[in-house]
């Protein structure tokens, strides 16, 4: 459901390829020899230390609660752009996204910049000043409790946070 809803949404880009985007995250872990399980939104998460929820656009009943409990109990949740935007009927969730995961991530998204296919931006990590390339979508984040780990390197949002960490519960 998340896949079709995301690919059929009318914005911020028509170039959304859910499987391609998820594969980017899978490959990053695979390159580091980190085993990856692909599980359903309804799966029990208790046996995991880390959960990556790429493009968790559609938040069905119980999903946000499971992720919140997972983090409260000490788990690490990695989220991405296009998370927590729509409910189970593909209607936008009011109150800024990541919707019901806003407190877990400690931030909200003010706006999303859709980059042209050939366009990139930079991520500059705070600690070591390493620079990484980013493309496709760039969220303008407004931090509530989260702390900045990396910032955008160019465009009108240069210096704004793009990689963050938030302590929530024991996670």
Language-model features: locations:
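Carbohydrate-binding surfaces of carbohydrate-active enzymes
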Residues: 1-171
